[in-house]
Amino acid sequence: KRLLQNLGIEINQVIPEGGFIEDLQNLPKAWFNFVPYREIGLMTAVYLEKEFGMPYVSITPMGIVDTAECIRQIQKHINELAVVSLEETVDYEPYIYQQTKFV
């Protein structure tokens, strides 16, 4: 959650954290699904992509390389949808640089 918040991304729904069946109706509002642990949620993310065209990111943000790649995948999905909805694109490279420059 903290990584997404640091990037300024509003979290639509965390499944199954404190969720109710009624909350599932909010799933289509997401621009992408984030699956930080492939063992939990990957099959659902694949299904949602296949059935509804909802992209997903399934890179676990652990370590410098994987965290940077995860952020770049998130950026890619946001920018693809931002172009369609005529919103501004994002550039998270400065954030990645800031987080890794002293390592």
Curated annotation (Swiss-Prot):
Protein's pathway: Porphyrin-containing compound metabolism; chlorophyll biosynthesis (light-independent)
- Which GO terms label this protein's molecular function in UniProt? 4 iron, 4 sulfur cluster binding; ATP binding; metal ion binding; oxidoreductase activity
Describe cofactor binding as the record notes it.
Binds 1 [4Fe-4S] cluster per heterodimer. The cluster is bound at the heterodimer interface by residues from both subunits.
- Metal-binding keyword on record: yes
Superkingdom of origin? Eukaryota
Q: What is its main location?
A: plastid
Q: Which GO terms describe its biological process?
A: light-independent chlorophyll biosynthetic process; photosynthesis
Q: Which residues form a coiled coil?
A: none
EC number in record: 1.3.7.7
Cofactor(s) the protein needs: [4Fe-4S] cluster
User: Where does the signal sequence lie?
Assistant: none
SUPFAM superfamilies per record: Helical backbone' metal receptor
Does this UniProt record's set of keywords contain 4Fe-4S?
yes
GO CC, sorted alphabetically, is: chloroplast
Where, per UniProt, does this protein localize? Plastid, Chloroplast
The cross-references to InterPro entries, in alphabetical order and at most eight, read: ChlB/BchB/BchZ (IPR050152), Nase/OxRdtase_comp1 (IPR000510)
Do you know which PANTHER family this protein is assigned to?
Answer: LIGHT-INDEPENDENT PROTOCHLOROPHYLLIDE REDUCTASE SUBUNIT B
Q: Hey, which family's this protein in?
A: Belongs to the ChlB/BchB/BchZ family.
What does the function comment of this entry state?
Answer: Component of the dark-operative protochlorophyllide reductase (DPOR) that uses Mg-ATP and reduced ferredoxin to reduce ring D of protochlorophyllide (Pchlide) to form chlorophyllide a (Chlide). This reaction is light-independent. The NB-protein (ChlN-ChlB) is the catalytic component of the complex.
Q: What is this protein called?
A: Light-independent protochlorophyllide reductase subunit B
Q: Which organism is it from?
A: Spinulum annotinum
